[in-house]
Curated annotation (Swiss-Prot):
It holds the Pfam family Enolase_C. SUPFAM superfamilies: Enolase C-terminal domain-like, Enolase N-terminal domain-like. The keyword Lyase applies. Residues 165-221 are annotated as: Disordered. Its EC number is 4.2.1.11. This is Enolase 4. Residues 165-175 have a biased composition (Basic and acidic residues). It catalyses: (2R)-2-phosphoglycerate = phosphoenolpyruvate + H2O. One of its GO terms (biological process) is glycolytic process. Keywords: Glycolysis, Lyase. Residues 193-203 have a biased composition (Basic residues). Gene3D superfamilies: Enolase-like C-terminal domain, Enolase-like, N-terminal domain. It comes from Xenopus tropicalis. Substrate binds at residues 287, 518.
Length: 574
């Protein structure tokens, strides 16, 4: 009898202690007060979906989402080569959910690296997946809002990988030493002022100075796309969880306060490709791009580009003697055509403009991606602008000056010279810098080197084409855009030659505040996806009354002595 009484008393005491613990638990979390508030507000509001209202009310008191897993998958980029997709999973309201993913393609500083075998891409993707698996426990429990902290962790993780890759390559060089490359022999040319055949005896000759040797290209570490893809995926996860468009999230990372007006980047749209991979003799124009006049919307710009492109196709078909010409498309998303003269692609565009009622230099401008680093013949020490036609770095300056004098609608030259030809870059800046943008793409330092140097003066250019590839983090992108603006240069956000399918580049361009965006042409899906995203962003800004327009093209002052500036556009209001 006494045993039963004692057992009942023990159970009663345990129930009492449990009730006290529950009361203390709910008291600490203010559950009873918030539950009372929720019930009162629900009764007063009388929502149609009572449980939906209660769910929304209590959601504001839930813990912030945290990363619970990072996963990597092998996917294909826009050219069918393997790359890596980084997926971010977060714990949201006690549930593990897949939030988003991102894909970026690998790109090399070396022009020939893009021609590597498929097994190298496979190897890089496999390593990237392993890196993402290794990074998963390091990021577990962190908030996607901690972009700077996560990017620093990624950079710290990546730094030893660079050293390992350098050591591996050094060991390979020591094991199988490469033969020394022959230095280009000095080139002789007639003395200035001497005409061929003038005077008696031998003609005086001038020995041209040998070109600077090619700099050692920055090594691309296999697996590096894992870093850039994961950094972007974290930014996307934060924007998804906060229900904020990615471009607004990026701008918030850049500025403490969001601006009241956003300026859409002006698209540089690829129309033709006449580079080293195209048929015909012409090598100089890897891309011929159009730049719409200021004051136009992205929609108006794309409509104009599409109209011009269709007219060019008609002209090519009309000139073909065998019926409609086969439309070869470059990975850049534009038509690949042959040319035998430097002016030939420009003449084709001029003729198309006349047919559709557009005026070059008024409605639209031209840009040329020269990709000079792909034209250099190191044995001759000259650029092969046409098959069998070679130009020294000094002669290239005369070529560009003459070309722009004959076609003043050319607004920009991309990579007109190698980065090593710094003296000629300075001469070109003096000759054309006040009326033509001189952009460095492959001629620019890598993003990490730009941030280390804190300078945009090598080479002296109007601005830089920045691409989100390999190990570049979102924080580094923010830093390099701040540097470009601080140096009063022009920022261009571009895509690599082999681009992945995704539209985040458009958000990055708007969020980072790029003046121009270079996405390629309109003939490949991975390119048009990004243009479509630009259109969607423009529509959102229009609906919000926050869309602004550039009113003129301003050229940075590159040197103390420059030629007179080119024609300015009349400001427009829309």
């Amino acid at each position: 009898m006494s045993y039963r009484a004692g057992d009942a008393a023990r159970r009663a005491r345990e129930r009492y202690e449990l009730k006290q613990a529950a009361a203390e638990f709910y008291r600490k979390l203010s559950v009873t007060e918030r539950l009372e508030e929720a019930l009162n507000s629900t009764f007063c509001l009388g929502p149609e979906d009572v449980y939906g209202h209660l769910a929304n009310y209590f959601a504001q008191f839930s813990k912030p989402p945290t990363i619970c897993q990072i996963r990597g998958r092998k996917v294909l980029d826009g050219t069918g080569e393997p790359t890596v997709e980084a997926e971010v999973f977060c714990t949201v309201k006690n549930m593990d959910k897949r939030i988003c993913s991102s894909v970026i393609s690998a790109a090399s500083e070396h022009p020939k690296a893009s021609k590597g075998p498929e097994q190298e891409s496979n190897h890089s993707a496999d390593i990237a997946i392993q890196w993402l698996n290794d990074l998963s426990p390091k990021l577990r429990g962190m908030s996607p809002d901690e972009q700077n902290k996560i990017d620093q962790l990624l950079s710290d993780f990546y730094q030893p990988k660079i050293e390992e890759e350098k050591e591996r390559r050094q060991m390979e060089r020591e094991a199988s030493p490469m033969p020394l490359q022959p230095e280009p022999s000095p080139v002789t040319s007639p003395a200035p002022g001497k005409k061929k055949g003038s005077g008696k005896g031998k003609k005086a000759a001038v020995v041209e100075k040998p070109i600077p040797p090619e700099e050692t290209p920055e090594a691309v570490v296999p697996g590096s796309p894992a870093i850039g893809a994961l950094s972007l995926a974290v930014a996307k996860a934060s924007s998804v969880l906060s229900k904020t468009p990615l471009y607004l999230h990026i701008r918030a990372l850049r500025n403490e306060k969001l601006p009241t007006e956003f300026f859409m980047p002006t698209p540089m749209i690829s129309i033709l490709s006449c580079g080293t991979s195209s048929p015909g003799k012409l090598n100089l124009m890897k891309e011929v791009l159009i730049i719409p006049q200021t004051g136009l919307t992205v929609q108006q710009s794309l409509d104009m580009a599409l109209m011009l492109q269709n007219q060019i196709v008609k002209q090519i078909n009309a000139a073909s003697k065998t019926g409609p010409a086969i439309k070869n498309v470059s990975p850049l998303g534009c038509m690949l055509i042959g040319g035998d003269r430097i002016e030939q692609p420009l003449d084709l565009i001029c003729e198309a403009c006349q047919h559709v009622g557009l005026e070059l230099g008024t409605n639209l401008y031209l840009a040329i991606n020269c990709a000079a680093h792909e034209l250099m013949d190191y044995n001759k020490g000259k650029y092969e602008v046409l098959s069998g036609t070679f130009k020294s770095p000094d002669e290239m300056i005369d070529l560009y000056v003459d070309l722009i004098n004959r076609q003043p609608a050319i607004l920009a030259l991309l990579d007109p010279l190698r980065k090593e030809d710094t003296v000629q870059w300075e001469s070109l800046a003096k000759a054309l810098g006040s009326k033509c943008y001189l952009f460095a793409d492959a001629a620019s330092k890598p993003v990490c080197k730009l941030l280390e140097s804190g300078s945009m003066n090598s080479p002296p250019c109007s601005g830089t084409v920045i691409k989100h590839t390999n190990e570049i983090t979102i924080s580094q992108l923010l830093g390099v855009f701040k540097l470009i603006e601080g140096e009063n240069r022009v920022a261009v956000l571009g895509c690599p030659y082999k681009e992945s399918v995704g539209d985040s580049t458009a958000d990055l361009a708007v969020g980072l505040g790029a003046r121009f965006v270079k996405l390629g042409g309109l003939l490949r899906g991975e390119r048009t996806t990004k243009y479509n995203r630009l259109l969607a962003i423009e529509d959102e800004l229009t609906q919000a009354g926050a869309l602004g327009f550039w009113t003129k093209n301003e050229f940075p002052v590159l040197c103390e002595v420059q030629n007179q500036p080119g024609p300015q556009e009349t400001p427009e209001t829309q």
